[in-house]
């Protein structure tokens, strides 16, 4: 792989200038993750909340929903949009959204949540792990639904998490099958030796993912090395180290990387180091392939859960829901430049 990087340097520069020919495409779906709590609680989002979607509010009440989104990037934006669309379908004009973005700052999440609590909102959507943690700390009475977080047990420090948080919290998780992601990496890069695990140490969900996939990758014969950065300020230097010492880099569903994919792309592409991503937004920005969920659909599932809660269902008994299907996706121009042969069951991402 190291020798290949030099040979590919010229070809890869074309990726920076524009898109090359596609590698071929078709669709595939993968079953929900079979790790941790998801074994017992994974449900189809098509079935989840379907009854709520067919019910229309007739009591005339206007529901006020506070939305705390950690940061602005494609995945979280899509989850918020799906959530709002699902609730609007049920309640029409009788639901109002106070959508606020914390710009990646956990302390700002807490400030936003405190505002929702002061307003006595009817329900809070916490989009991403830091937002969920702030909401859990901010109120034990207002219903909280999380989304775009990976593992609620890790995020909320719950021992022996069984899939149901209890109290005033439930939601959806974006956990992809990490064993499937490892298998996908091996399918595309069977001759690679060293895998760099690039992630933000401040994001509990990212740490969980790299720890988990490391075990799967090592079983496939790879040597793995952690490359943790504390925030966007040291992403460039850490990513450079990873690119210098890795054959392939893996990035989980990391919010900091998702908001700074250009940094990763501008380092890894000239270095000739392909990036396998945990979700499609990161993949579009800097990756070659991903096994990803639809964040819009995840948001819709969360919105259907919210409708049930607002119509009287007990949130304390509602298990965390997971995406039922996952799609192998690839970026055609980068795969072409790297000379990657993409199997027919991958779907080309729009560039």
PLM region descriptions:
Residues 308-351:
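Hinge/cleft segment of the Venus flytrap/periplasmic-binding protein
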Residues 204-273, 279:
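Pocket-lining segment of extracytoplasmic ligand-binding domains
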Residues 65, 83, 170-217, 318-335:
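An alpha-beta-alpha
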């Amino acid at each position: 792989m190291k020798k290949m990087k030099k040979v590919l340097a010229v070809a890869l520069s074309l990726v920076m200038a524009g898109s090359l020919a596609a590698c071929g495409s078709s669709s595939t779906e993968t079953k929900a993750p079979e790790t941790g709590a998801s074994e017992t609680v994974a449900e189809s989002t098509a079935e989840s909340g379907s009854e709520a979607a067919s019910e229309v509010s007739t009591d005339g009440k206007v529901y006020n929903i506070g939305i705390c989104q950690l940061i602005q990037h494609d995945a979280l934006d899509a989850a918020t949009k799906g959530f709002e669309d699902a609730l609007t379908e049920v309640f029409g004009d009788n639901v109002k959204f106070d959508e606020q973005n914390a710009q990646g700052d956990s302390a700002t999440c807490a400030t936003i949540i405190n505002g929702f609590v002061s307003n006595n909102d009817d329900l809070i959507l916490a989009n991403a792990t830091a937002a969920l943690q702030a909401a859990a700390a901010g109120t034990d009475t207002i219903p909280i639904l999380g989304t775009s977080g990976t593992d609620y047990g890790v995020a909320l420090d719950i021992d022996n998490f069984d899939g149901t948080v209890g109290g005033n919290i439930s939601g959806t998780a974006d956990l992809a099958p990490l064993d499937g992601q490892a298998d996908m990496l091996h399918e595309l890069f069977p001759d690679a030796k060293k895998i760099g695990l690039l992630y933000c140490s401040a994001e509990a969900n990212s740490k969980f993912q790299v720890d988990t996939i490391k075990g799967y990758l090592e079983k496939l014969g790879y040597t793995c090395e952690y490359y943790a950065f504390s925030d966007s300020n040291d992403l460039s230097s850490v990513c450079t180290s990873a690119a210098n010492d890795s054959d392939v880099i893996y990035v989980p569903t990391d919010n900091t990387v998702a908001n700074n994919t250009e940094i990763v792309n501008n380092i890894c592409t000239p270095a000739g180091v392909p990036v396998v991503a945990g979700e499609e937004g990161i993949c579009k920005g800097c990756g070659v392939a991903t096994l990803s969920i639809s964040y819009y659909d995840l948001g819709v599932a969360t919105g259907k859960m919210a409708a049930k809660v607002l119509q009287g269902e007990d949130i304390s008994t509602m298990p965390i829901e997971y995406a039922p299907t996952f799609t192998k996706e690839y970026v055609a121009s980068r795969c072409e430049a790297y000379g990657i042969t993409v199997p027919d069951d991958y779907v080309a991402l729009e560039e």
